[in-house]
Amino acid sequence: MTAIQQFFKTFFLTELLKGLALTGRYTFKRKFTVQFPEEKTPISPRFRGLHALRRYENGEERCIACKLCEAVCPALAITIESETRADNTRRTTRYDIDLTKCIFCGFCEESCPVDSIVETQILEYHGEKRGDLYFTKDMLLAVGDRYEKEVAAAKAADARYR
């Protein structure tokens, strides 16, 4: 670029005028902003939100304590302890997920052989202190019990893609 061209660009403020023209073009176009608490956009059926533990229809928890979800978790957010029952089946005594560590990758859900751990469509949850986002087995089972119909419907809708 020659010195004369540079002089005219800076003297006549062409960059500024180009920026103002761009701003003016978008000023009168339709806005795409969503006012979140009042308006909500549709959520993908594959959205990965709050975790839940599921039960069978007879009320027994599905988790067989294989610890695959704990092994596959890249953030080390899952802690499982188990014991063997009288009928030689393993069940969890402790199943904790630290949501402050969790990256919501979905590996735990994919690795579970019995579809025990699932990620729900729940995206609005919070904690006022760090311990509020540490979910124990009872808390995860309560979430699963409360939202079982929605979880089952989402699993059925996604079954052909799995």
Swiss-Prot record:
4Fe-4S ferredoxin-type domain mapped to chain residues: 54-83, 93-122
A GO molecular-function descriptor: NADH:ubiquinone reductase (non-electrogenic) activity
Gene Ontology cellular component list: plasma membrane
Topology versus the membrane: Peripheral membrane protein
PROSITE patterns: 4FE4S_FER_1 (PS00198), 4FE4S_FER_2 (PS51379)
Cofactor info, note text: Binds 2 [4Fe-4S] clusters per subunit.
InterPro entries: 4Fe4S_Fe-S-bd, 4Fe4S_Fe_S_CS, NADH_quinone_OxRdtase_chainI
Catalysed reactions listed for this entry: a quinone + NADH + 5 H(+)(in) = a quinol + NAD(+) + 4 H(+)(out)
Binding-site list for [4Fe-4S] cluster 1: 63, 66, 69, 112
Subcellular location: Cell inner membrane
Domain of life the protein comes from: Bacteria
Pfam families: Fer4_7
Record-listed E.C. numbers: 7.1.1.-
Record keywords: 4Fe-4S, Cell inner membrane, Cell membrane, Iron, Iron-sulfur, Membrane, Metal-binding, NAD, Quinone, Repeat, Translocase, Ubiquinone
Main localization (coarse): membrane
GO biological process annotation, one example: aerobic respiration
Cofactor annotation: [4Fe-4S] cluster
Stated family: Belongs to the complex I 23 kDa subunit family.
Xref: PANTHER family: NADH DEHYDROGENASE [UBIQUINONE] IRON-SULFUR PROTEIN 8, MITOCHONDRIAL, NADH DEHYDROGENASE UBIQUINONE IRON-SULFUR PROTEIN 8, MITOCHONDRIAL
Quaternary assembly: NDH-1 is composed of 14 different subunits. Subunits NuoA, H, J, K, L, M, N constitute the membrane sector of the complex.
Role played: NDH-1 shuttles electrons from NADH, via FMN and iron-sulfur (Fe-S) centers, to quinones in the respiratory chain. The immediate electron acceptor for the enzyme in this species is believed to be ubiquinone. Couples the redox reaction to proton translocation (for every two electrons transferred, four hydrogen ions are translocated across the cytoplasmic membrane), and thus conserves the redox energy in a proton gradient.
Protein name listed in UniProt: NADH-quinone oxidoreductase subunit I
Natural source organism: Burkholderia pseudomallei (strain 668)
Designated gene of the protein: nuoI
